[in-house]
Amino acid sequence: MTTTEIGRYGEKLAVKFLKKNHYRIIAKNSHQSHNEIDIIASYKAYIVFVEVKTRTVNSNMYSDYGTPASAVTISKQKRLITAARSYLSKNKKYFKKQPRMDIIEVYLSNETGKPLKINHFEDAFGE
Protein backbone atom coordinates (compact mmCIF):
# COMPACT_ATOMS: atom_id res chain seq x y z
CA MET A 1 0.00 0.00 0.00
CA THR A 2 1.13 3.55 -0.67
CA THR A 3 1.23 6.06 2.18
CA THR A 4 -1.94 7.67 0.78
CA GLU A 5 -3.72 4.30 0.74
CA ILE A 6 -2.54 3.58 4.28
CA GLY A 7 -3.86 6.96 5.43
CA ARG A 8 -7.25 6.51 3.73
CA TYR A 9 -7.58 2.99 5.15
CA GLY A 10 -6.77 4.32 8.63
CA GLU A 11 -9.46 6.99 8.23
CA LYS A 12 -11.99 4.34 7.17
CA LEU A 13 -11.15 2.27 10.26
CA ALA A 14 -11.40 5.37 12.46
CA VAL A 15 -14.90 6.11 11.13
CA LYS A 16 -15.97 2.53 11.94
CA PHE A 17 -14.45 2.87 15.41
CA LEU A 18 -16.28 6.14 16.09
CA LYS A 19 -19.61 4.80 14.84
CA LYS A 20 -19.21 1.72 17.04
CA ASN A 21 -18.73 4.10 19.97
CA HIS A 22 -21.93 6.06 19.18
CA TYR A 23 -20.43 9.06 17.38
CA ARG A 24 -22.46 10.50 14.51
CA ILE A 25 -20.25 11.23 11.51
CA ILE A 26 -20.99 14.65 10.02
CA ALA A 27 -18.20 14.94 7.44
CA LYS A 28 -15.04 13.25 6.19
CA ASN A 29 -12.06 14.95 4.58
CA SER A 30 -13.59 18.40 5.00
CA HIS A 31 -11.53 21.21 3.46
CA GLN A 32 -11.61 24.42 5.51
CA SER A 33 -9.30 27.45 5.24
CA HIS A 34 -6.86 25.53 3.00
CA ASN A 35 -6.65 22.73 5.58
CA GLU A 36 -8.29 19.32 5.82
CA ILE A 37 -10.15 17.89 8.78
CA ASP A 38 -10.13 14.10 8.54
CA ILE A 39 -13.40 13.50 10.40
CA ILE A 40 -16.03 15.76 11.92
CA ALA A 41 -18.41 14.03 14.30
CA SER A 42 -21.08 14.79 16.86
CA TYR A 43 -20.99 13.09 20.25
CA LYS A 44 -23.21 14.08 23.16
CA ALA A 45 -22.60 17.81 23.78
CA TYR A 46 -19.52 17.91 21.52
CA ILE A 47 -18.67 18.70 17.94
CA VAL A 48 -15.52 16.63 17.49
CA PHE A 49 -12.76 17.36 14.99
CA VAL A 50 -10.62 14.26 14.52
CA GLU A 51 -7.12 13.97 13.10
CA VAL A 52 -6.34 10.39 12.11
CA LYS A 53 -2.76 9.17 11.93
CA THR A 54 -1.91 5.68 10.72
CA ARG A 55 1.34 3.73 10.93
CA THR A 56 2.41 0.32 9.76
CA VAL A 57 4.29 -1.56 12.46
CA ASN A 58 6.02 -4.88 12.95
CA SER A 59 4.78 -7.59 15.31
CA ASN A 60 6.39 -5.74 18.25
CA MET A 61 4.32 -2.61 17.44
CA TYR A 62 7.49 -0.79 16.37
CA SER A 63 7.55 1.89 13.68
CA ASP A 64 10.59 3.74 12.36
CA TYR A 65 8.52 6.92 12.46
CA GLY A 66 7.43 7.02 16.11
CA THR A 67 3.87 7.02 17.34
CA PRO A 68 1.19 8.27 14.98
CA ALA A 69 0.07 10.97 17.44
CA SER A 70 3.61 12.39 17.57
CA ALA A 71 3.11 13.46 13.94
CA VAL A 72 0.45 15.96 15.04
CA THR A 73 2.89 18.82 15.60
CA ILE A 74 2.07 22.19 17.16
CA SER A 75 1.96 23.64 13.64
CA LYS A 76 -0.51 20.95 12.52
CA GLN A 77 -2.61 21.55 15.64
CA LYS A 78 -2.84 25.27 14.85
CA ARG A 79 -3.94 24.51 11.27
CA LEU A 80 -6.60 22.11 12.54
CA ILE A 81 -7.91 24.66 15.04
CA THR A 82 -8.11 27.24 12.23
CA ALA A 83 -9.99 24.75 10.07
CA ALA A 84 -12.37 23.89 12.93
CA ARG A 85 -13.12 27.58 13.51
CA SER A 86 -13.80 28.02 9.81
CA TYR A 87 -16.16 25.04 9.81
CA LEU A 88 -18.07 26.33 12.85
CA SER A 89 -18.40 29.81 11.35
CA LYS A 90 -20.10 28.27 8.30
CA ASN A 91 -22.21 25.76 10.24
CA LYS A 92 -24.00 27.73 12.94
CA LYS A 93 -26.23 24.77 13.88
CA TYR A 94 -23.26 23.28 15.78
CA PHE A 95 -22.43 26.54 17.54
CA LYS A 96 -23.99 25.42 20.84
CA LYS A 97 -21.91 22.25 20.92
CA GLN A 98 -18.57 22.24 22.71
CA PRO A 99 -15.72 21.88 20.19
CA ARG A 100 -13.19 19.15 20.88
CA MET A 101 -10.00 18.18 19.06
CA ASP A 102 -9.26 14.44 19.09
CA ILE A 103 -6.52 12.28 17.64
CA ILE A 104 -7.02 8.69 16.56
CA GLU A 105 -3.98 6.48 16.05
CA VAL A 106 -4.35 3.44 13.82
CA TYR A 107 -1.69 0.73 13.81
CA LEU A 108 -1.58 -1.66 10.86
CA SER A 109 0.55 -4.77 10.43
CA ASN A 110 3.33 -4.06 7.93
CA GLU A 111 3.14 -7.74 6.94
CA THR A 112 -0.61 -8.18 6.39
CA GLY A 113 -2.00 -4.64 6.38
CA LYS A 114 -4.57 -5.70 8.97
CA PRO A 115 -5.46 -3.39 11.86
CA LEU A 116 -3.67 -4.23 15.11
CA LYS A 117 -4.68 -1.41 17.44
CA ILE A 118 -6.63 1.84 17.57
CA ASN A 119 -6.01 4.51 20.21
CA HIS A 120 -8.45 7.40 20.67
CA PHE A 121 -7.16 10.50 22.44
CA GLU A 122 -10.12 12.69 23.35
CA ASP A 123 -9.51 16.41 23.80
CA ALA A 124 -5.93 15.82 22.65
CA PHE A 125 -5.12 19.48 22.12
CA GLY A 126 -6.66 22.93 22.07
CA GLU A 127 -5.86 26.56 22.44
Task: Locate each region found by the language model.
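Catalytic cores of nucleic-acid endonucleases
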Residues: T54-S109
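Conserved catalytic cores of phosphodiester-cleaving nucleases, focusing on short active-site segments
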Residues: L18, I39-M61, L80
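Solvent-exposed, charged helical/coil patches
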Residues: M1-V15, K19-K20, G66-S70, A124-F125
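A short acidic/basic microdomain associated with nuclease active sites
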Residues: K19-S33
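Conserved protein-kinase catalytic-loop segment immediately C-terminal to the catalytic Asp
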Residues: D38-A41, E105-Y107
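Short, low-complexity, polybasic intrinsically disordered segments
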Residues: E105-E127
